[in-house]
Structures are given as structure tokens and as C-alpha cells.
Amino acid sequence: MIFGAITNSWREQLPTHTVKELVGAAVEKGAKHIELRQTCLGECESGAGDDWRPNLDELQSVVEAYPSLTFDLAMALPCLTQTIDPVGDMFQAALAGAKLVGGAQPHLRVVDPAPVEGPWSSPSDIPEEALGLAGLATEAARQGVIMSMENSSLPIRNMAMLVEQVRSMVPEAAGAGLGLCPDPTNQLRRFPDSDPLAELDALPLDMIKLVHFKQ
């Protein structure tokens, strides 16, 4: 397992430090991977919401400064509650950023921060907007980008149900590139009586693209 850090851990330090400096501090503590998280990228981003864009020149500078590290790009994307245009400027900019920082294995990690009614009992409960992931996953795969989703307001098992449903709707290669970034702590906040570690353990290995651990 490769351990690393997420830039939103440095929210308080970002006003007085560059992302490049903070990544260097993480490297000194043994980090091998860095998740570059929207809203916590300092000089490496501009705008907010639909107008958010990664600053590709600054991201390239960070990646070139630490060639031994691997990186993924992470963003909030309301892909479960809204229909996102796969060829729209926002998603295309995110894919460009993921390809720039990801090297041989570009990875875009997304999370829908909006509340989602759940948990779901069966695939028939999945809202139509969430099935729009098929178009996003297909476009990401076309550009060679792995796409993973973090669970926010749904349990891990429901996110797995969604991935399985979307995989059945797209070509095999596109489906293989779509997976999860499980966060057991997120699940406990919403469903305190659930067992997120058991749900994580039950996931097929090819569905796990990244795992978040936090206190």
C-alpha cells in the first residue's frame, strides 16, 4: 500500500505557504502520494464552483519538483444530483489537470457534496442524474483517465451498486476505469450504526482505486 496526504489537510497553512512547499514537507514525513484537492490548491487553482479551474502551469511546477511522487487530482462534482456535460469546460479542465499530474496513470477523484436520498435498496432507486456517470466515465476512459468517486452522503455499498450499474451501461474498458475512493469515516458520520469496514472489505479489488483514512 502506498501512503500519502491530501492537500485539504493543509487548509490553515495555505495562506502563508505554497503548495510546492507543503508537498515538500509531506515528502520529508514519508509521503509517497499526494491528492491535489480542489479548494486547497493555493497557487495551483483559480475560481470556485462551476468556474473552478486548475492552474496547469503551477501544477506542472509541483509535479516536476517531486518526480518520485505520484499524484491524483480531486474535485467536488455534483455528478449524483446533476447532469454534468462530459465535454463541458469544467470536466474537460479537470481531465486535463488529472492527465498533467497523473503521469502514466492519470486519476480524477470526484465527490458529490450535495445530500443524496438514501440508502438505496436496489438499482431501481438510483436517480437518473447519477446514471449520467456513464457519459463521464466514457469520456474519462477515452482520455486515459481513471475516475473514482468518494462516498459522501451514501454508504459504500450503495456507491458500489452505482458503479456496477454504470459499468453495465458502458464499454468494458470505460467500466474498468470507473471505481471508488471509499472513506469509512464519511459513512460513520451519516450512518453511525453501519459497518463501513465490512463494506470496504466486500468491494471487488478492481473497484477500489484509492482509500481515504482520517481521524
Question: Which residues does each PLM region occupy?
Answer:
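N-terminal pre-domain/capping segments
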Residues: 1-99, 103-104, 141, 160, ...
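Acidic/histidine-rich catalytic cores of soluble enzymes
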Residues: 5, 11, 16-17, 33-34, ...
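Charged helix-capping and loop-helix junction motifs
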Residues: 18, 49-57, 87-93, 122-133, ...
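Conserved radical SAM core fold
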Residues: 38-43, 112-117, 187-188
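Substrate-binding cleft and catalytic face of glycoside hydrolase catalytic domains
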Residues: 72-78, 113-115, 154-156
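Active-site groove signature of glycoside hydrolases
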Residues: 98-122, 143-153
